[in-house]
Amino acid sequence: MKYINLMLTIILALSLETFHIIDACREIGEVCSKTVFDKCCGNTVCKLRGPFYGECVECLNSGERCWRNSECCSGYCRWFTCQD
């Protein structure tokens, strides 16, 4: 019974820590990975410089890789690239 209580306590502690990590976000200029674990705060976006490695910026410039219109400074993302 003690073993089960110990395991449940450990699982609960790890779960709470995971939720804390997921809720955290990065400010402009900080390192990000464009994942739920390393996301940028607010309306800022992660400008990737390599696989899962980038920096939080206000918006992406023309020619940079994007997923949504809202990520681009121009507001226009076409074929995964910001356009003017």
Curated annotation (Swiss-Prot):
Name the source organism. Answer: Schistosoma japonicum (Blood fluke)
One short Pfam name that applies is: UPF0506
Q: For this UniProt entry, what is the primary localization, expressed as one broad class? A: secreted
Q: What is this protein called?
A: Uncharacterized protein SJCHGC09800
Q: Which GO terms describe its cellular component?
A: extracellular region
* Record has Secreted as a keyword: yes
Indicate whether Phosphoprotein appears among the record's keywords. no
Keywords assigned by UniProt, alphabetized:
Disulfide bond, Knottin, Secreted, Signal
